[in-house]
Amino acid sequence: THQGAEWVDGSDAWLGEMWPNNEERKREIIRDFDLVADWSQRHNIRILLGEFGAYSKAPQDSRVRWTAFVREQAEAHGFAWAYWEFGSGFGVYDPNVKVWREDLLKALIP
């Protein structure tokens, strides 16, 4: 999710990598969400997924698929969520041309 991020050393090596959107990778995310949900239930503490997103240098279709799946899992597990962020490198809005990144917006708000 940080492909080509200027503040992450070596992240240019990840440029162009696609999130495979296969069952194995989905199970990894589901497993992590299940662990958090179990902890949440045992301790009676609600969860806010306070930050998730994929940097704009990653392939857009991969960003959209990953974002949609993470959002879907957060909602399926009863977690509130907040996308990182509105209008910069991860943004769902492009302030330079004043347009929504529609595919990413639909991944968040279908």
Region spans (language model):
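Substrate-binding clefts and catalytic carboxylate motifs of secreted carbohydrate-active enzymes
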Residues: T1-P110
